[in-house]
């Protein structure tokens, strides 16, 4: 619960001043958006956070679902296990994260995601980097050393490494064909 509170607090701070759809949606609609990102046997008992970090529903398993990550609330929902909760806390705060010292983690994003640079987690300049917008996918955390044989090209087909040479490195597992942007 401590990690959920920390994520909630960090998310609320980051969302100050962001354009949010949250005020236009009911709590039940936000819960449906968030829980639609994972299989029902996970999301039905998960804790659900609003985009502002407040707890909309307490859960009874170790999963947390949210309607999106800042500033894209209600657009790219995800359900994450406890390892991903810790990763998100570090990512949101741009704090150190050592994948070699952490355990395995799973994140579901069955509704897809916004376009991101596969090379740099904080790049917002679409003229630089390798941009990819995934449809439904899983994200897996593990020691970076275990990902050495995976491709780095998000368009190669199958799992690939995102954000190599960065402490937020993780494995992407697309569940549909990843199309190159036009």
Segments predicted by a language model, with ranges:
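Eukaryotic compositionally biased low-complexity/IDR segments
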Residues: 3, 20-21
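Primary mode marks residue(s) on the alpha4-beta5-alpha5 output face of response regulator receiver
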Residues: 23-182
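Sec-dependent signal peptide recognition
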Residues: 2-9
């Amino acid at each position: 619960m401590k990690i959920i509170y920390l994520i909630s607090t960090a998310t609320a701070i980051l969302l100050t001043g962001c354009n949010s759809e949250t005020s236009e949606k009911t709590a039940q609609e936000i819960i449906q958006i968030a829980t639609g990102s994972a299989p029902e046997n996970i999301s039905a008992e998960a804790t659900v956070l609003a985009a502002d970090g407040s707890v909309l529903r307490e859960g009874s398993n170790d999963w947390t679902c949210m309607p999106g990550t800042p500033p894209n609330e209600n657009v790219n929902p995800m359900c994450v296990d406890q390892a991903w909760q810790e990763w998100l806390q570090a990512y949101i705060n741009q704090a150190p994260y050592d994948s070699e010292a952490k355990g395995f983690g799973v994140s579901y994003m069955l509704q897809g995601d916004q376009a991101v640079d596969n090379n740099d987690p904080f790049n917002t300049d679409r003229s630089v980097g390798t941009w990819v917008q995934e449809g439904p996918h899983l994200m897996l955390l593990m020691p970076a050393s275990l990902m050495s044989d995976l491709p780095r090209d998000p368009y190669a087909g199958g799992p690939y490494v995102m954000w190599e040479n960065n402490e937020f490195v993780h494995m992407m597992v697309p569940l549909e064909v990843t199309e190159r942007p036009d």
